[in-house]
Amino acid sequence: MENGGSKSHTVDEIFQMVQQSKKWLEITPDKRSHYMTAYKRMECIYDRDVASLRYSELQNLVDGIEGAFYPKRDVKTILQKIVDMAVLEEVCSSSKSEVIRCIELPSKPLTGKDARTPEEMQAIWDDWNKTHDLITGYALIMAYTGMRTGELFAQDVTQVNPAGQVIVGGIKTEAGKNREIPIADCIVPIVQAVLPQARYGMVAYDENAYYSNWAQMIQRTGIRPLGSYCQRHTCYTRLHELVPAVSDVVINSIIGHSNSKISKLANSYGHISLSAKLEAVNRLTL
């Protein structure tokens, strides 16, 4: 297929190359079977030029796969294999591989080691105070609001109110959509700083630039090379560690987690006030 004078390569064409590779043939038959099942779930992008695939649409593709963590993980793995092969064949930019690696997966319980340590958070704060780099600002916003990377990109900036310390937004589950997300006192100046430059939701640049800048921030601060998902998990983990404890109902209303048991509790307690959420996030010392 010709595209602007250069030959494009479809997802299906590249996947055929993947199946002929030595690495693919070394995979056990059982695992290959799982991967083929995952590939069948990606039919909607078979004819797409690999180089044209965008983070937001691939995140939506993975989110839309039926099942919990493992089916979605297998689709992400196949996407990674396809894009890595395309990079080797020099038909798309190497930055595309990093985009796939940053696709977020649900449900599999994260552990405390996936949250930023106090030392890492201090390094991020130090970087913000020194550079005021936007990517560092996004990292701090996610750590104190529990927002997903995709939520930053999807956010309607008219629904961001630093003065009122609230963001109305969110994606994914019913619990996550259109929720009141509190803006902690300490990040109000950061939200005010990033909003004037917002072009892609709350973000100033596209996904490729975002992850490139993220990698530079990781290198600059010396913190572990975890994806930006860990900022959200840091918020969730540290809220659970507060003493006296913050109720699960309040935490889930901030984070936007969907949990049937918690949802029933929330219904019995009624709407969780913004003031209750602000009280919780203002107790965080990240």
Give residue spans per PLM region.
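Conserved tyrosine-mediated DNA breakage-rejoining catalytic core shared by Y-recombinases
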Residues: 102, 145, 154-190
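Short, polar N-cap/turn motifs at the start of nucleic acid-interacting alpha helices
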Residues: 159-163, 245-268
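Active-site/catalytic core of tyrosine-dependent DNA strand-transfer enzymes
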Residues: 184-224, 235
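N-terminal core-binding DNA-recognition domain of tyrosine site-specific recombinases/integrases
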Residues: 4-12, 16-92, 110, 131, ...
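Basic, Lys/Arg- and aromatic-enriched nucleic-acid-binding interface segment
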Residues: 69, 73-77, 88, 92-149, ...
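Catalytic-site neighborhood detector that most strongly recognizes the C-terminal catalytic loop/helix
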Residues: 170-175, 255-286
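C-terminal catalytic core of tyrosine-transesterase DNA break-rejoin enzymes
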Residues: 70, 140, 144, 151, ...
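Phosphate-coordinating loops and pocket residues in cytosolic domains that bind phosphorylated ligands
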Residues: 55, 126, 154, 162, ...
